[in-house]
Amino acid sequence: MRLESTGKPDQYKVWLSDEELDTLRRHAGSKRNDLILQLGGYVGLRAFEIPQVTPQHVKRTSDGSNYRLRVPEGKDTTGNGGKPRDAYLPAAVERDLHQYQQENDLRPSDPYVSLTESGVRAVVKRVADATADETGDDDYRHVSSHDLRRRFAQRLLVDERMNPRVVMAVGGWDSFKAIEPYLNAPSEQVVNDAFQGVDLGV
């Protein structure tokens, strides 16, 4: 992982790899906590959006093989209240959501994660600390809920080179300026690939 200074004491932007996200998931401690990690890292939900989603917000697309997750009130920078959006829901995450609903007898209107925004952030912090304790890598202690969304954006924009307009639509970004930081930050694998076969003179 790569740490980027924010200019504030002991606060960093953390650029995770998928392998590091998997490591966090292995130390989640519960299925609910793992869902929080997945909704942030694979679906791109913000901390305040995660408690909004319920089983009734999962929709199958017309082709029958893809899913969307309706976010009722996403971020709206215009100040007119939350903006709904349909996030792309990977099939593996949909299966885990469905299984969690069945195991916990959730009604269609019950939230998958019955926490406040600060509660979601606290879960990620606890999981990050537990991961640091178990792996001996203290960089994990800096991981926040927003870093999960950062991995989501970097995966699509840099690793997969997806059309930025698609990423903006499913992730709830209003402008190219908002996603530019993700476009300009190569992932660890992209850096490794760039140096393959390069003569460094040593």
What are these regions (language model features)?
Residues M1-D22, T78-P90, L106-R107:
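DNA breakage-rejoining catalytic core of tyrosine-based enzymes
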Residues R2, V14-A47, L200-V202:
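Basic, Lys/Arg- and aromatic-enriched nucleic-acid-binding interface segment
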Residues G40, P51, M168:
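The alpha-helix within a helix-turn-helix
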Residues Q52-D96:
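Conserved tyrosine-mediated DNA breakage-rejoining catalytic core shared by Y-recombinases
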Residues R70-G74, N192-V198:
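Short Lys/Arg-enriched helix C-cap and helix-to-coil transition segments
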Residues P90-Y140:
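Active-site/catalytic core of tyrosine-dependent DNA strand-transfer enzymes
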Residues K125-A169, F176, E188:
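Short, basic (Lys/Arg/His-rich) helix/loop patches that form interaction surfaces
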Residues G171-Q196:
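Catalytic-site neighborhood detector that most strongly recognizes the C-terminal catalytic loop/helix
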